[in-house]
Regions:
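Conserved anion-binding
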Residues: 77-116
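Conserved N-terminal beta1-alpha1 strand-loop-helix module at the mouth
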Residues: 1-70, 78, 93
Length: 116
């Protein structure tokens, strides 16, 4: 059987573009889970363009409570900055069910290639 994990980055991107807390990533992620998906996926980036470290930790608690998979994708070499603890630190704190390594850079709009 194929499992579906929904990436909620664009929900966070829209929230950040608007400022404030709307749309609410936690509420919409819970709705997505209640529709029957097998997991939630996020891709936190050092520039905080969508998912923030706080979102990661909040969504981790939700996925534990709802008993669905939590997948964090990102560049394992992404270092910390003033507002971002670094990808490896996020993974160590959140302890996702799955971690997908993505070779993207800060200059990329979106991930578009694999590892060489």
């Amino acid at each position: 059987m194929t499992n579906l994990s929904v990436n909620v980055n664009k929900i966070a991107w829209l929230r950040n573009a608007r400022g404030g807390h709307t749309p609410n990533i936690l509420e919409l992620s819970e709705l997505i889970i209640d529709c029957g998906v097998s997991g939630i996926t996020v891709h936190p980036r050092p520039d905080l363009r969508h998912i923030t470290p706080e979102d990661v930790y909040t969504l981790r608690e939700l996925t534990k409570r709802k008993k669905v998979e939590f997948n964090i994708e990102g560049n394992p070499y992404a270092e910390s900055n003033k507002h971002y603890p670094g990808f490896q630190e996020i993974i160590q704190i959140a302890k996702p069910d799955q971690c997908t390594l993505v070779p993207d850079s800060l200059e990329q709009i979106t991930s578009d290639h694999g590892w060489d």
